């Protein structure tokens, strides 16, 4: 057996026996390093004749390539083995709270939290979630909801209109989530029990108004729905949402094109301090509008008002978030201020449930 064959066998055995990256690195340095065994052999080529150099040089370089490839392969094996061992050894308890590290200090926006809270409440009552497009046609946003041609909401100063299309039709950014009521009635047969959270758009901006804001509406359609049912649903919602045992509500006559009769709902509260307290006090706070679905709206949804009836309500998510959590300025919701989010935001694991507490 030649000297090179013996060296090759020795080095390959050492590579195979290397148990970690440190050991394989030691073999590499001993063979291919500046003073390694193969490097020393390459240095002897200078004293050989041209013919010897050509023959022996090719064999030494072949040995060098073989050893280099074996080292790379062994490194990959050791790396894979280390990863497999680590995966087998490590376990993650997913029930533990998120660790407090910079990457895990994010906050849930109050609007997202409010939507989850409302969904939990109405989901417990048997309601399902419905959604629709933000860009609506004039028909779904106005006509189908019994808005007459001259209604102020159709004016440019109140609604965001798109440029007319090739047919001359102007689409709008929806001014309420009510178009989803029509779309749901067209697609489903009663009984219908839905809530509709979503973004809405109107040309208004101050401390309590924003050009884009959030609403949630509810709709119940069947053969026997009545005002008493509506009152019970809204009272149960307010008790659960504001987390109080009792609420006192008053229903004031009002007007909305899509309901008849229509009401504005106030809830009794205490406004003497910086935070509004519900379930106590002698003050009143308006929180939502509601009413029995107008017969014309039922017809637009493809339902016979002589057979079906229902009730609907709507409220501003931003407004009730401000009331519940004491946020003074609506514009702060959209300013992307990390300090505000740190103060008013919610932890990722603060999942609202009726049993664990909505805002625990």
Swiss-Prot record:
The record's section on Pfam families has: Phe_tRNA-synt_N, tRNA-synt_2d
Picking any one GO molecular function of the record gives: magnesium ion binding
Name what cofactor the protein needs: Mg(2+)
| Gene Ontology cellular component list | cytoplasm
Catalysed reactions listed for this entry: tRNA(Phe) + L-phenylalanine + ATP = L-phenylalanyl-tRNA(Phe) + AMP + diphosphate + H(+)
Which CDD domains does the record associate with it?
PheRS_alpha_core
Annotated positions binding Mg(2+): 260
Could you tell me the EC number(s) of this protein? 6.1.1.20
Output the HAMAP family linked to this UniProt entry: Phe_tRNA_synth_alpha1
Q: What is known about its subunit structure?
A: Tetramer of two alpha and two beta subunits.
Q: Which family does it belong to?
A: Belongs to the class-II aminoacyl-tRNA synthetase family. Phe-tRNA synthetase alpha subunit type 1 subfamily.
The protein's matches in NCBIfam families, at most eight in alphabetical order, are given as: pheS (TIGR00468)
| Name assigned to this protein | Phenylalanine--tRNA ligase alpha subunit
What is the gene name? pheS
């Amino acid at each position: 057996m030649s000297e090179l064959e013996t060296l090759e066998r020795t080095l390959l055995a050492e590579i195979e026996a290397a148990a970690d990256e440190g050991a394989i690195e030691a073999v590499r340095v001993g063979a291919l390093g500046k003073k390694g065994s193969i490097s020393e052999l390459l240095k002897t080529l200078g004293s050989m004749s041209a013919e010897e150099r050509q023959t022996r040089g090719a064999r030494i370089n072949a040995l060098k390539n073989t050893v280099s490839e074996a080292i790379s392969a062994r490194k990959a094996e050791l790396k894979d083995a280390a990863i497999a061992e680590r995966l087998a050894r490590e376990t993650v308890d997913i029930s533990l709270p998120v660790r407090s590290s910079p990457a895990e200090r994010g906050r849930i926006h109050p609007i997202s939290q409010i939507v989850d809270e409302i969904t939990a409440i109405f989901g417990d009552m048997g309601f399902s979630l419905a959604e629709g497009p933000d860009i609506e046609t004039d028909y779904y946003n106005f006509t189908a909801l019994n808005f007459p041609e001259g209604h102020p909401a159709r004016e440019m100063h109140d609604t965001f209109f798109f440029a007319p299309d090739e047919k001359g039709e102007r689409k709008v950014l929806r001014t309420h989530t009510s178009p989803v009521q029509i779309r749901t009635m067209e697609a489903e047969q009663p009984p219908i029990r839905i809530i509709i959270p979503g973004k809405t758009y109107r040309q208004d901006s101050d401390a309590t108004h924003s050009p884009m804001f959030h609403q949630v509406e509810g709709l119940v359609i069947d053969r026997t729905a009545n005002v008493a049912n509506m009152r019970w649903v809204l009272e149960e919602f307010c008790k659960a949402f504001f987390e109080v045992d009792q609420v006192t509500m008053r229903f004031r006559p009002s007007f909305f094109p899509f309901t008849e009769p229509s009401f504005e709902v106030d809830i009794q509260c205490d406004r003497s301090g910086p935070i509004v307290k519900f379930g106590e006090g002698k003050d009143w706070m308006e929180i939502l509008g509601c009413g029995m679905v107008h017969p014309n709206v039922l017809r637009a949804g493809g339902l016979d008002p002589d057979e079906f009836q229902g009730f609907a309500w709507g409220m501003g998510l931003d407004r009730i978030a401000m009331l519940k959590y004491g946020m003074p300025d609506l514009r702060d919701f959209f300013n992307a201020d990390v300090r505000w989010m740190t103060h008013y935001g919610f932890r990722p694991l603060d999942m609202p449930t009726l049993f664990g507490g909505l805002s625990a």
